[in-house]
């Protein structure tokens, strides 16, 4: 699996917010591939096993993983071990309370029925959110999150790899533009089980 660049991460989705630059990029050698620590986002993750771990790996190395939260520490141990500097939590509310001022964005990959409330709490704090599907379980929850996004101005994305993956977009463009001719057969592979 190849690493995703910061540009691709912001474009395809996880979260978007430019940090305040303390030192000019030219001084830090940005043209040579170096990134100022102040240009990195501070990311927290809730639900870090399975898809949560996969989502964290998409930003590992390009962003700062500062806090991790999971109710099953036995299952989450491998991720905790991978990010020893990140603060560890059982309860996302405690993580938000203690780390809120230092978090730029949150990755949410918990049990489906908890997505909306964890997302709403993060958005209310002004945090950018990448949340796994399904984002909500009701029209009410969807409307609430839509209003929160509008009122807070945060960037949000729901993870739907089948529709939001950069490769999927590229192939669709090729087909729509007639660049590869008529498609008569498609073969797919999957990395299951990822959980």
Which residues make up each language-model segment?
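N-terminal Rossmann-like dinucleotide-binding module
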Residues: 13-83, 162-165
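Predominantly a Rossmann-like dinucleotide-binding segment in NAD(P)-dependent oxidoreductases
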Residues: 47, 51, 55, 152-158, ...
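Short acidic-hydrophobic, aromatic-tinged amphipathic segments that line or gate anion-handling sites
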Residues: 87-91
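N-terminal Rossmann-like NAD(P) cofactor-binding module of classical short-chain dehydrogenase/reductase
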Residues: 106-107
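Beta-strand-loop-alpha-helix segment that lines the small-molecule cofactor/substrate pocket
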Residues: 111-112, 116-164, 178
